[in-house]
């Protein structure tokens, strides 16, 4: 294998390490119910109980406060963005932009399909969100950094406006109900969506519009890869 081919295919250690840490964090956060709850009953009355409760609080999600658990999914999506940009640049050496985009669409659409297949009743979990966020990012993957930054903020601002000024926020934050006073109320726009009963069944990770916020971290990941590839450590930090 010649040096050019090696340069094209070699792993980037720091990206792999960051991805590995994110996966470890996901395992830790999702292991609470399986491993840590039995330990809590064992430690009752012990001097270690308070420290253990503080630990389990940090690996749990809460409606209020920001914990360690809340850092893991955004970090993983960030790393996905780094990998997406790397894949675009490497594939672009031998493929046209149209072919490159087609390959990315296929990859992220497959993630969405796999997510829909395995998350029955919990559609908006990790794979689905990553797939949809990736699809949103594909038109922007080759744009200038400034364009990607503006698009990232535009997506998250649009999502926050919908969340704050429509009944979507009520649905997302309060158990899947669009109205606090009328549990049966469903907005007209939602009723017009095919299969809305399934799509709006669980308000997980922001629901159907959640990828509008997740794509911000993914696009920031593409920017981080550009800085890393430029080997400018001061800028990267």
Residue ranges of model-derived segments:
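N-terminal signal-anchor module of multipass membrane proteins
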Residues: 2-96, 100
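Hydrophobic transmembrane-helix microenvironments that flank and shape a buried ionizable site
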Residues: 13-16, 27, 67, 104, ...
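Transmembrane helix-loop junctions in multipass membrane proteins, especially transporters and channels
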Residues: 38-42, 90-92, 164, 168-172, ...
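Active-site-adjacent bridging/hinge elements
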Residues: 48-57, 111-115, 188-197
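Transmembrane alpha-helical segments and their boundary/interface "anchor" motifs
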Residues: 70-75, 88-119, 123, 127-137, ...
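Specific transmembrane alpha-helix
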Residues: 73-89, 127-139, 208-230
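Long hydrophobic alpha-helical segments that form multi-pass transmembrane helix bundles
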Residues: 146-229
């Amino acid at each position: 294998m010649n040096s050019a081919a090696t340069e094209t295919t070699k792993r980037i250690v720091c990206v792999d390490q960051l991805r590995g840490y994110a996966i470890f964090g996901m395992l830790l956060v999702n292991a609470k119910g399986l491993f840590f709850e039995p330990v809590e009953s064992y430690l009752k009355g012990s001097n270690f109980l308070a420290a253990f409760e503080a630990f389990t609080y940090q690996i749990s999600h809460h409606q209020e406060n920001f914990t360690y658990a809340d850092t893991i999914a955004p970090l993983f999506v960030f790393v996905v963005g780094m990998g997406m940009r790397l894949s675009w640049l490497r594939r672009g050496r031998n493929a046209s932009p149209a072919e490159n985009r087609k390959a990315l669409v296929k990859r992220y659409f497959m993630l969405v399909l796999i997510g829909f297949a395995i998350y029955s009743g919990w559609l908006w979990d990790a794979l689905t969100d990553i797939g949809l966020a990736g699809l949103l990012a594909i038109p922007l993957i080759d744009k200038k950094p400034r364009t990607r930054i503006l698009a990232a903020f535009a997506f998250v601002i649009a999502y926050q406006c919908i969340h704050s000024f429509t009944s979507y926020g009520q649905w997302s934050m309060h158990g899947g109900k669009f109205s606090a006073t009328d549990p049966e109320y469903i907005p007209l726009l939602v009723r017009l969506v095919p299969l809305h009963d399934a799509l709006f069944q669980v308000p997980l990770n922001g629901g159907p519009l959640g990828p509008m916020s997740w794509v911000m971290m993914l696009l920031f990941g593409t920017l981080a890869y550009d800085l890393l590839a430029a080997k400018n450590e001061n800028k990267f930090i």
